Amino acid sequence: MTGAVPTIQRLTKRSEFLACARAPSTAKGAIVVQARPRDDDAALVRVGFTATKRIGGAVERNRAKRRMREAARALLPNFSAPGIDYVIIARGGVLTRPWPRLLDDVKTALLRLAADRAAPHIG
């Protein structure tokens, strides 16, 4: 994306996560990314992370969220759009996925969602 790097904040409220759950999403490898455009004019990006009990116990879920947070920290400044809320959801294999492949999963999902937003919708 071009322009200034957007400010990145965290999603913290359940209602924000539920709003993103109704938004378009894409799955790639070990993650799912949901993206919801906000109605406000704030030029910031908000992101939240989810790892369910299917991933494992609390230790595994926290490790999965740490890996997703680092991937988001590395990629969102370059591959996100201002005014969008993202939720990154861990899938099976997120803990064992090699780091370069996990980064590629997140990057590809972000690019797919950006392409879907840019494509004209017919019908």
List each language-model region with its residue ranges.
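Positively charged, solvent-exposed patches that mediate nucleic-acid binding
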Residues: 1-123
